[in-house]
Swiss-Prot record:
Role this protein plays: This protein may be involved in virus assembly.
Protein name in UniProt: Uncharacterized protein A-100
One Pfam family recorded for the sequence: DUF5517
Organism: Sulfolobus spindle-shape virus 1
InterPro entries in UniProt: DUF5517
Length: 100
């Protein structure tokens, strides 16, 4: 039996189809920075920037790119849902750097 809390979490996952995010890695004279902008809808936007040396997100970004490519080629709903969950976990790893 599925608990109400689990059901609610599943529903929230379903509604996250239209989240857009932009991740920028840059360099300034005093160090590296990572900027993220997330648009949940037209009215709700989150932006955050952190400054740090040696920001290591290359693996996560490569994994997101691979997941996106695989998602486009898969036509089976169950496989697409599994890829979506993996992509959300990878995005969560990236967001953990920002302390959201």
């Amino acid at each position: 039996m599925v608990s109400p809390q689990t059901r609610k979490e599943e529903e929230l996952l379903e509604k996250q189809n239209s989240v857009f995010y932009l991740l920028t890695l840059g360099r300034k004279p005093y160090g590296s920075y990572l900027h993220i902008k997330i648009e949940l809808d037209e009215d709700e936007k989150l932006e955050k920037e952190i400054y740090a040396d040696n920001i290591k997100l290359e693996n996560e970004l490569r994994q997101l790119k691979r997941l996106y490519e695989v998602y486009q080629s898969v036509e089976i709903d169950d496989a697409q849902k599994a890829i979506q969950k993996e992509a959300l976990l990878t995005i969560a790893k990236i967001l953990s750097v920002f302390d959201f």
